[in-house]
């Protein structure tokens, strides 16, 4: 890739139909883990006009009112009016959960001689990524895209823009010069709204109240292209506008396309599923590599075989930004991080009901106290082992 280029990422709000599905799935996961932390959960959700379908595989001793959890999640998001196409009070909720296959369970539950040798719940490959473009060590385009739709939700909730409705999408294009963010080129924001708002008034308010306060002043250089509701009217949205499904926003959930994705979604899955837990561990590893000053960009890939505890591969790529070799960093990762599935669960304390909060505005790059995978507590040890200087904030 050339050093001067445009790069774009997108995000969606909590009211987007796919995110409604993700949040219901993770709310159900949390409700189960709160009672039985060793549950096996793969909770999938479909939501459409006036309808929510809950399906998947759950093995647990917990007694959870799944229908009530789904309704409370829809209420929290803001779908509390039949005019919005789905109303938490009146929507139909169908439940069709099965138990986890015993063929899968025999590999996942096996302990061998060491209780950390729990097998992976499936084969697969997962990626983690970090870079020094933001204080959170995230790519700038996805970071800004998340903040835009998060602000849209905040202004909707506090009543400052009362004509906003829950569904929204954002997209940010950044101009890079010499491989670093230089300026903001284009911002797209489409928001659902009440039918009585004038489009000109909406566009002015969105630019002045949502977009401009979110953009870093140092990246405003020349004219930025603002595209607000470019198709015009956006009254029908949410699950009425599109059928929502768990796991359809995996790029929004991660790095906005700035890093590869192994293909496995996160929401609704307990941490025995390496699709989720190993991706969280990958973020933890990559963020600590960058925080340690070992590189300004770091990508890690890990892979697993079902029923086998040790990863089948570990790879680190620092894209030529490493202060030491990628082979050295890979060795340090294997020395300082336990990437067996149960080792990850213990390292990041993942048997907690913390997942509903992850299901909107990104699983990574948010300094939430529950997000243990965002900690940089290994950075100093990595820096010492590699002979590098950690970033100033950690020194």
UniProtKB/Swiss-Prot annotation:
InterPro entries: ADOMET_SYNTHASE_CS, S-AdoMet_synt_C, S-AdoMet_synt_central, S-AdoMet_synt_N, S-AdoMet_synthetase, S-AdoMet_synthetase_sfam. K(+) binds at residue 44. Keywords: ATP-binding, Cytoplasm, Magnesium, Metal-binding, Nucleotide-binding, One-carbon metabolism, Potassium, Transferase. Catalyzes the formation of S-adenosylmethionine (AdoMet) from methionine and ATP. The overall synthetic reaction is composed of two sequential steps, AdoMet formation and the subsequent tripolyphosphate hydrolysis which occurs prior to release of AdoMet from the enzyme. It comes from Paraburkholderia phymatum (strain DSM 17167 / CIP 108236 / LMG 21445 / STM815). It catalyses: L-methionine + ATP + H2O = S-adenosyl-L-methionine + phosphate + diphosphate. Signal peptide: none annotated. One of its GO terms (biological process) is one-carbon metabolic process. The lineage of its organism: Bacteria, Pseudomonadati, Pseudomonadota, Betaproteobacteria, Burkholderiales. Pathway: Amino-acid biosynthesis; S-adenosyl-L-methionine biosynthesis; S-adenosyl-L-methionine from L-methionine: step 1/1. The keyword Cytoplasm applies. Its main location: cytoplasm. Belongs to the AdoMet synthase family. GO terms for molecular function: ATP binding; magnesium ion binding; methionine adenosyltransferase activity. ATP binds at residues 16, 167-169, 233-234, 242, 248-249, 265, 269. This is S-adenosylmethionine synthase. Its cofactor is Mg(2+); K(+). It is found in: Cytoplasm. Binds 2 divalent ions per subunit. Gene3D superfamilies: 3.30.300.10. The keyword Lipid metabolism does not apply. Homotetramer; dimer of dimers. Pfam families: S-AdoMet_synt_C (PF02773), S-AdoMet_synt_M (PF02772), S-AdoMet_synt_N (PF00438). It is an enzyme of class 2 (transferase). NCBIfam families: metK.
């Amino acid at each position: 890739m050339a050093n001067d280029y445009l790069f774009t990422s997108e995000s969606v709000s909590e009211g987007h139909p796919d995110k409604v599905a993700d949040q219901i799935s993770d709310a159900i996961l949390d409700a189960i883990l709160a009672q039985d932390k060793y549950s096996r959960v793969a909770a999938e959700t479909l939501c459409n006009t006036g309808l929510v379908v809950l399906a998947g595989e759950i093995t647990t001793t917990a007694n959870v009112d799944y229908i009530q959890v789904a309704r409370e999640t829809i209420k929290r998001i803001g779908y509390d009016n039949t005019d919005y196409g789905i109303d938490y009070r009146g929507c139909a909720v169908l439940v069709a959960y099965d138990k986890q296959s015993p063929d899968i369970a025999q590999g996942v539950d096996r302990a061998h001689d060491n209780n950390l040798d729990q097998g992976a719940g499936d084969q697969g490959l997962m990626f983690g990524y970090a870079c020094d473009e933001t204080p959170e060590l995230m790519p700038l385009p996805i970071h800004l895209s998340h903040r835009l739709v998060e602000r849209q939700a905040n202004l909707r909730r506090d009543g400052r823009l009362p004509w906003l409705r829950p569904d929204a999408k954002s997209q940010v294009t950044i101009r890079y010069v010499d491989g670093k963010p230089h300026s903001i080129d284009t911002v797209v924001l489409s928001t659902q709204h009440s039918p009585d708002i004038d489009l000109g008034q909406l566009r002015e308010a969105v630019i002045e109240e949502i977009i401009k306060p979110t953009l870093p002043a140092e990246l405003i250089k020349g004219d930025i292209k603002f595209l607000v509701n470019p198709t015009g009217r956006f009254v029908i949205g949410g699950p009425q506008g599109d059928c929502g499904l768990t796991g359809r926003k995996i790029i929004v959930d991660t790095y906005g396309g700035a890093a590869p994705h192994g293909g496995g979604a996160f929401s609704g899955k307990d941490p025995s599923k390496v699709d989720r837990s190993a991706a969280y561990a990958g973020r933890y590893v990559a963020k600590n590599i960058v925080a340690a000053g070992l590189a300004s960009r770091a990508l890690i890939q890990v892979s697993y075989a079902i029923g086998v505890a040790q990863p089948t591969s570990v790879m680190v790529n620092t894209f030529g930004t490493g202060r030491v070799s990628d082979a050295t960093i890979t060795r340090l990762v294997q020395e300082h991080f336990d990437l067996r599935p149960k080792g990850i669960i213990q390292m990041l304390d993942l048997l907690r009901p913390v997942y509903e909060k992850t299901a909107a505005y990104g699983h990574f790059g948010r300094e939430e106290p529950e997000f243990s995978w965002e900690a940089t507590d290994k950075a100093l040890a990595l820096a010492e082992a590699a002979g590098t200087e950690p970033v100033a904030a950690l020194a």
